[in-house]
């Protein structure tokens, strides 16, 4: 199963499909053509409906402002996790919603 070994799964996805990717988990794994990154930001409160959609939106937003695919793949989980960590300082983790994560992104990203 993918979840049993995220790093190996990320490597296999890259090898089999020649693709960058993000495996979202408590410690998300991002894989590019050159490296595998383990994201250490984020918290258990982010395991909520829509959180993965927020992560996808961050990737798309980074691409839209000119980031290359590798940078977007590795930066998005970090930004997502930092936003979730900021939310967790303001409310109980069990109360976090995807919209709360979105609201914190403006405090991380420059205008």
Model-derived features with residue positions:
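Charged C-terminal helix
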Residues: 83-111
